[in-house]
UniProtKB/Swiss-Prot annotation:
Organism: Schizosaccharomyces pombe (strain 972 / ATCC 24843)
Annotated function: Required for correct translation termination. Positive regulator of the stability of the N-terminal transcription factor domain (Sre1N) of sre1 which is released from the membrane and enters the nucleus to activate hypoxic gene expression. Also acts as a direct inhibitor of ofd1. Functions probably by inhibiting the ability of the ofd1 to accelerate Sre1N degradation in absence of oxygen.
Regions of compositional bias (Basic and acidic residues) in chain numbering: 19-28
Residue spans of biased composition, Polar residues class: 32-47
Protein name: Negative regulator of ofd1
Length: 393
């Protein structure tokens, strides 16, 4: 159970949400110029609190205090997207500050909904993401990993809270995947961990992340506003890890995780009003997922003397899915550099097909794509130049 914070002044009147958000934004920039971090008393025991307490309370109503908290956090993400990192950091600390205030002014903290814990956890995780800049405002005892641990702990405290679980599950999964990223880095750079298999260190966190991602991936047509390309960036960690250590997992497990990752990316842009830029990010992630799996089967094909036809069919299927997704991407962005990706896929198809006619057709399509890119001003690497010269000879 979370320890109670000192009771501050009670909220009284009601202001419009936007007025409150603007006031919070200004206060975040003003109050957080010094140290700021979550408190042990709030269940974030791995992080010291360097914030000066201020008993001047903002105005809250029962129905909108949590939405205001999310508003602050979302404003921080918008600032980050616009490369205003300092403002993003201020708003992240502002979110943590306001979460603390809500705790201080809640008589029964068990009534706080899951969305509160999700917002608090997401803000803590954002500190770890922006740690290089944020650490200027933190105590020396704080570390990037301590904020990830605090984010996990805060989200876990919300599992028994009332309310919808979607945002909380997303916050938990993201925090577990960031933990994977840090542990892989530590394994590569710290002698004390060098003798421990990296899978032993991180697989428990992978399993926990998947546990919370799976229900979010169900019903890919259902709109979920917190599921955005920005919130799904930790999925790159999962994809990269599984690709790097794919031989440690069963084919069934990899396929299962691939389907979850793909479903989440597609679900993030299911809203017809989704900006084209977000659609592009999501489709590129799906394409990366497909080509990664194609390479997985091609590697198996290179090292197997049995089930050759089955592996060829599986690799071809993933490569054809890749072509379909590339076509979707090219309708969104016709940058000539993208033609080189199409050429790569076609060359992979040529590598695995068994009849010469199909092979020659794929090589021709690859060559044409490279020439089109070159004709549009793309500077080719020596490998592409060599391929075009060899095929055209």
């Amino acid at each position: 159970m979370i320890g109670r914070r000192p009771q501050g002044l009670r909220a009284a009147a009601s202001l419009k949400k936007q007025q409150q958000l603007e006031k919070q934004k200004q206060e975040a920039s003003y109050e957080l110029s010094g140290n700021s971090s979550p408190s042990k008393e709030n269940g974030s025991e791995n992080v010291d609190n360097g914030e000066m307490e201020d008993e001047t309370m903002l105005v809250y109503t029962e129905e909108d205090n949590i939405s205001q908290l999310w508003g602050l956090y979302e404003m921080s993400r918008e600032k980050l997207e616009n490369d205003d990192i300092d403002a993003s950091v201020s708003l992240v600390f502002g979110t943590i500050h306001e979460a603390d205030r809500i705790l201080r002014n809640t008589e029964d903290i068990s009534t706080l909904p899951k969305d509160f814990h999700a917002a608090y956890s997401s803000a803590l995780l954002a500190v770890s993401e922006l740690f290089e800049i944020a650490q200027k405002r933190l105590k020396e005892t704080n570390t990037e990993e301590s904020y990830i641990d605090a984010a996990i702990e805060r989200a876990q405290l919300g599992l028994d809270a009332p309310g919808n679980e979607s945002r909380l599950f997303l916050a938990l999964a993201r925090a577990y995947l960031e933990k994977v990223r840090v542990l892989v880095w530590r394994h590569d750079n710290e002698e004390s961990l060098a003798n421990i298999p990296v899978t032993q260190l991180v697989n428990p966190y992978i399993e926990k992340a998947i546990q919370y991602l799976r229900p979010l991936a169900q019903d890919s047509t259902e709109y979920f506003d917190a599921l955005t390309p920005d919130s799904l960036r930790p999925l790159y960690i999962l994809s990269s890890y599984l690709f790097q250590f794919g031989d440690q997992f069963s084919e069934a497990f990899l396929l299962d995780v691939c389907s979850i990752i793909t479903a989440l990316w597609l679900k993030s842009v299911v809203d017809p009003n989704t900006p084209a830029y977000y659609k592009l990010i999501a489709q590129e992630a799906v394409l990366n997922n497909y080509t990664t799996f194609a390479e997985y089967y091609m590697d198996l094909l290179d090292n197997s003397e049995s089930n050759v036809d089955d592996l060829i069919n599986k690799a071809s299927s993933w490569l054809n899915n890749s072509v379909d997704t590339w076509n979707v991407i090219y309708t969104l962005d016709k940058s000539p550099e993208r033609l080189l990706k199409l050429a790569d896929i076609k060359m992979d198809l040529a590598q695995i097909v068994q009849d010469e006619a199909s092979q020659d057709n794929y090589l021709k399509e690859a060559c044409n794509a490279i020439k089109e890119a070159q004709g549009s001003g793309v500077e080719l690497s020596p490998d592409y130049v060599e391929f075009v010269e060899a095929y055209s000879a």
